[in-house]
Amino acid sequence: MPLTKVYLERENMIKFICYPKCTTCQRAKKWLDDNKIEYELRDIKLDNPTLEELTEWYNKSGLPLKKFFNTSGLLYKSLDLKNKLPEMTEEEMLKLLVTDGMLVKRPLLIGDDLVLVGFKETEWKDISQQN
């Protein structure tokens, strides 16, 4: 299922950051489309989040930084991050995340007052009521 619909970036538009080959991202995209929620699509493999973006999203989310790591990914496992992350500072973790989009948990849904990491329909339902 190709990800083809891309809306022009507008101020206040929700950013949908995904990896198009990821089935969870495909389900999340379908959910956004089915709920008629406009978004700007960004391929995390081609356009990895910057340090500034990740820092802002992390601070806005209220989530532990570990939640931003794709713990089921091959790169995460090959780098043995399960054992290394507990010893790392937040700054070190953020700098590591920006090195490769495949380390970042996806999809990400980013809005003015919104940061959702991963796709859980129950958490995403609130945004469909705002649009």
Functional labels for PLM-detected ranges:
Residues 2-12:
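Short, Lys/Arg-enriched N-terminal segments with co-localized hydrophobic residues
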Residues 11, 34-36, 63:
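Short, well-ordered coil/turn elements that cap or connect secondary structure elements
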Residues 12-31, 40-42:
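Local sequence-structure signature of Cys/Sec-based thiol-disulfide redox active-site neighborhoods
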Residues 26-29, 33, 77, 125:
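Class I S-adenosyl-L-methionine
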Residues 36-38, 112-113:
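Short glycine/proline-enriched coil/turn segments at helix->beta-strand junctions
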Residues 38-48:
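A short beta-strand-loop structural module common to alpha/beta enzyme folds
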Residues 46-127, 131:
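Thiol/selenol-based redox catalytic cores and closely related redox-interacting motifs
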